[in-house]
């Protein structure tokens, strides 16, 4: 990112502390992104509405409100419907990518996270 370019804000909705910590480390090294976090779908919805991040990374298997339902609610809300969402799943099954896209996600990636691949997806989503 060029000098003086704005830092992009990402919301990572993830209940696994290790996954959150690792992603935070990766993005800290880049210095291009500020990471907001939520531990469940309900908190993710609230933080997205209040903070208006540039992009949301949404784990699909969350407590309380899962990532599928959180995505539906975010896309149905005029205040958050335009925020790109990349779905993440550790238990990716056949058809999950298609289901995530049909739910309103802009992209899908499986865990374990391959940082370069995820970064390319983030940059592509932010460019559109």
Identify what each model region corresponds to.
Residues 112-122:
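C-terminal output helix
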Residues 17-36:
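Two-component/phosphorelay signaling modules centered on CheY-like receiver
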Residues 14, 39:
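Conserved acidic carboxylate
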Residues 63, 81, 93, 112:
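The feature encodes the CheY-like receiver
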């Amino acid at each position: 990112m060029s000098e003086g370019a704005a830092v992009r804000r990402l919301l990572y909705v993830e209940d696994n502390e290790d996954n959150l910590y690792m992603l935070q480390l990766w993005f800290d090294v880049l210095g291009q992104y500020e990471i907001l976090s939520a531990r469940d779908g309900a908190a993710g919805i609230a933080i997205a509405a209040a903070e208006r991040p540039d992009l949301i990374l949404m784990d699909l298997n969350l407590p309380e409100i899962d990532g599928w339902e959180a995505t539906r609610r975010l896309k149905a809300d005029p205040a958050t419907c335009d925020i790109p969402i990349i779905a993440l799943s550790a238990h990716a099954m056949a058809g999950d990518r298609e289901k995530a896209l049909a739910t309103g996600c802009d992209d899908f990636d499986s865990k374990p996270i391959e940082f370069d691949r995820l970064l390319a997806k983030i940059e592509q989503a932010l460019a559109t």
